[in-house]
Amino acid sequence: MKIEVDSFSGSKIYPGRGTLFVRGDSKIFRFQSSKSASLFQQRKNPRRISWTVLYRRHHKKGISEEAAKKRTRKTVKHQRAIVGASLELIKERRSQKPSDRKAARDSKLAKDKEAKKAAKAARKAEKAKAVASGASVVSKQQAKGSFQKVKATSR
């Protein structure tokens, strides 16, 4: 004796009971009662209808043997070296006090600022030297050859 399962409610359908619905794409749906068939045709979600097996499963109703819970794997963080920084260097930086780190950052910023200022001064001096030597200052447009208007010759 083959016992079928209701496509909507999940309840058992014994031989000689229920109806069969074959959709246009040849998928077969079995319904235990006209109630579940009607709800299926209304496109109701069986997980939201409280008497269906799917609802009970979804809301964990009537499950008494919950002793064996599923074991989940815990993710463990590992420190690994990055390209350009060894593990020791990373650990050393992590263990630094925030005040020390801030002081190091400030000193580096000051050093970079000084280097930038020096480079700017050097460029300025080079430009002044070029002007003093009497080199003619040519604008970019003149160097390219500015647009020359063609004179009309028809008159």
Curated annotation (Swiss-Prot):
Component of the large ribosomal subunit. Mature ribosomes consist of a small (40S) and a large (60S) subunit. The 40S subunit contains about 32 different proteins and 1 molecule of RNA (18S). The 60S subunit contains 45 different proteins and 3 molecules of RNA (25S, 5.8S and 5S). GO terms for biological process: cytoplasmic translation. Residues 89-129 have a biased composition (Basic and acidic residues). The keyword Transport does not apply. Keywords: Cytoplasm, Ribonucleoprotein, Ribosomal protein. Residues 87-155 are annotated as: Disordered. Residues 130-143 have a biased composition (Low complexity). Coiled coil: none annotated. It holds the Pfam family Ribosomal_L24e. One of its GO terms (cellular component) is cytosolic large ribosomal subunit. It comes from Candida albicans (strain SC5314 / ATCC MYA-2876). This is Large ribosomal subunit protein eL24. It is found in: Cytoplasm. The keyword Repressor does not apply. InterPro entries: L24e/L24_sf (IPR038630), Ribosomal_eL24 (IPR056366), Ribosomal_eL24-rel_N (IPR000988), Ribosomal_eL24_CS (IPR023442). Belongs to the eukaryotic ribosomal protein eL24 family. Its main location: cytoplasm. Component of the ribosome, a large ribonucleoprotein complex responsible for the synthesis of proteins in the cell. The small ribosomal subunit (SSU) binds messenger RNAs (mRNAs) and translates the encoded message by selecting cognate aminoacyl-transfer RNA (tRNA) molecules. The large subunit (LSU) contains the ribosomal catalytic site termed the peptidyl transferase center (PTC), which catalyzes the formation of peptide bonds, thereby polymerizing the amino acids delivered by tRNAs into a polypeptide chain. GO terms for molecular function: mRNA binding; structural constituent of ribosome.
